[in-house]
Amino acid sequence: MTHLFALSELPLDEIHRLLDEAEAFRSGRIWRPAAPMYVANLFFEPSTRTKCSFEMAERKLGLHVIPFDPERSSVQKGETLYDTVRTLEAIGVDAVVIRHHEDAYFEALRHAVGIPIINAGDGCGHHPTQSLLDLLTIRQEFGAFTGLTVAIIGDIRHSRVARSNAEVLTRLGANVLFSGPAEWKDETNPYGTYVEVDEAIARADVVMLLRIQHERHAETMGLTKEEYHARYGLTLERARRMKSGAIILHPAPVNRGVEIASELVEAKASRIFKQMENGVYVRMAVLKRAMEGRMEHGRMAEKWHVVQ
């Protein structure tokens, strides 16, 4: 079964293949299913970019998208995630995309369902498609990863983006720096070195900023937004000390004037909206992989063909 739960489960050659496939879609390659195939997006947390990006990718591939709203589903009556996914499998859905607030929600499904599951974010755990689109954006800029310095700045402890990216970037040969408030350090993450924010920004080829994950905090932040920006944000002054050719990334949503000065969101060095564009192509590649795995596993052999 061709699930995608975490990039840490994929060998580097498969990650490179996904990036190559995404680049091919970006260059205009068109794929279509030879017969109807169905996918459901189960988002148990709010989302704009990931949800809409998956839906765009699904439609570009000619997949049929089954509407699903947790607030108007039997989840509200106590139905479990497992029973929800098994129901969708039973009625003919070929793959599911899931975002869930629970870390590693997918472990209960890994060997229990017969359709591919794509993780669109699990609590503070993993966000594999975000990492893939970040990797694609970095590769487009620098051509390779070996020797690059990537500074991940902000709410490290509560960020699935930080966790996913630090692991895969380290495997790819990049040097990862972390920076942010001491109380938001992630001591369980073995990848990356903690430095002060000014040092991180000055050394980085890639400055990756993170949103404060207020919804995952047990306590309120002890700083005002203005204080956080001054101490840990990418201010205009700090941006002037970035290396020549360095780029700015952010998984979004962006809190302007908090983790990044508003003027920098669309500055020359920013690739924030390029990340969003790349997200569609990356998710097309991931969905294609999932559907091919579905065909090999079950009832739909020889389902895809290339449209030249």
UniProtKB/Swiss-Prot annotation:
Binding site residues for carbamoyl phosphate: 49-50, 99, 127, 130, 252-253
Keyword Zinc: no
Record-level Gene Ontology MF annotations: amino acid binding; aspartate carbamoyltransferase activity
PROSITE patterns associated with the record: CARBAMOYLTRANSFERASE
Record organism: Geobacillus kaustophilus (strain HTA426)
Positions contributing to L-aspartate binding: 77, 160, 211
Keyword Cytoplasm tagged: no
UniProt keyword annotations, A-Z: Pyrimidine biosynthesis, Transferase
Protein name: Aspartate carbamoyltransferase catalytic subunit
Short name of one Pfam family: OTCace
SUPFAM superfamilies linked: Aspartate/ornithine carbamoyltransferase
GO biological process: 'de novo' pyrimidine nucleobase biosynthetic process; 'de novo' UMP biosynthetic process; amino acid metabolic process
Superkingdom: Bacteria
InterPro entries with a match to the protein in the record: Asp/Orn_carbamoyltranf_P-bd, Asp/Orn_carbamoylTrfase, Asp/Orn_carbamoylTrfase_sf, Asp_carbamoyltransf, Asp_carbamoyltransf_Asp/Orn-bd
